[in-house]
Amino acid sequence: MILIIDNYDSFSYNLVQSVGEINSDLIVLRSDEIDVSKLQNLNIKHIIISPGPGHPDEYTICKQVVKFFAPYTPILGICLGHQIIATCYNASIKKSSPVFHGRASKIYCLKDKLFLGIHAPFTAARYHSLVVDQDKRGLDLTTCLKTIAITREGVIMACKHRYYHFTYGIQFHPESMLTIQGTKLLKNFLSLSYG
């Protein structure tokens, strides 16, 4: 089963529809309705943390989900979800300059299972006012996170956990029409498994 955590974003419906077209075995829970201990009783194979408003530090339950499930369940954070994953592992967040609302950017990515079969650079939709701060560390965001995709200007568009190899964050929206290969990326993520 796929768990989609809905952070009250207007794009959540599009995300649920896109994922449901790939695999209809999914459950959608609002972030303020989640109890990590109850989630353990579900047969969760993948977790997707949706976009949403606000700052990632306001979503403590999502951080609890990431910390509990990341060692054995593939997790994909989208936009706010990406920032939640980054802050779970000590990356910092800063204001985006400029703010992006429905703009497409070229994304330059490293070779990774998440981007398998996706021709780089690819075009993706951006809707955000915050970004993960690169903090002059190159590809090493923190001791356990690395950058795997950026814009031409060097803004982080995707990160991945070094040890929990299927924990990813992406700043862009794969469910948007502006993201040319978004469905392929979601299929790639949903094909990942720890065993």
Curated annotation (Swiss-Prot):
Active site: C79, H173, E175
BP GO annotations: L-tryptophan biosynthetic process
Compartments it resides in: Plastid, Chloroplast
GO molecular function annotations of the record: anthranilate synthase activity
Enzyme Commission number(s) from the entry: 4.1.3.27
Gene Ontology CC: one annotated term: chloroplast
PROSITE patterns: GATASE_TYPE_1
Predominant localisation class: plastid
Reaction(s) this enzyme catalyzes, per UniProt: chorismate + L-glutamine = anthranilate + pyruvate + L-glutamate + H(+)
Superkingdom: Eukaryota
SUPFAM superfamilies: Class I glutamine amidotransferase-like
Limits of the Glutamine amidotransferase type-1 domain: 1-195
Residues that bind L-glutamine: G52, P53, G54, Q83, S129, L130
Metabolic or biological pathway, per its Swiss-Prot or TrEMBL entry: Amino-acid biosynthesis; L-tryptophan biosynthesis; L-tryptophan from chorismate: step 1/5
UniProt entry keywords in alphabetical sequence: Amino-acid biosynthesis, Aromatic amino acid biosynthesis, Chloroplast, Glutamine amidotransferase, Lyase, Plastid, Tryptophan biosynthesis
NCBIfam families with a match to the protein in the record: trpG_papA
Entry-linked PANTHER family: MULTIFUNCTIONAL TRYPTOPHAN BIOSYNTHESIS PROTEIN (PTHR43418:SF4), MULTIFUNCTIONAL TRYPTOPHAN BIOSYNTHESIS PROTEIN-RELATED (PTHR43418)
Subunit structure: Tetramer of two components I and two components II.
Protein name per UniProt: Anthranilate synthase component 2
Gene: trpG
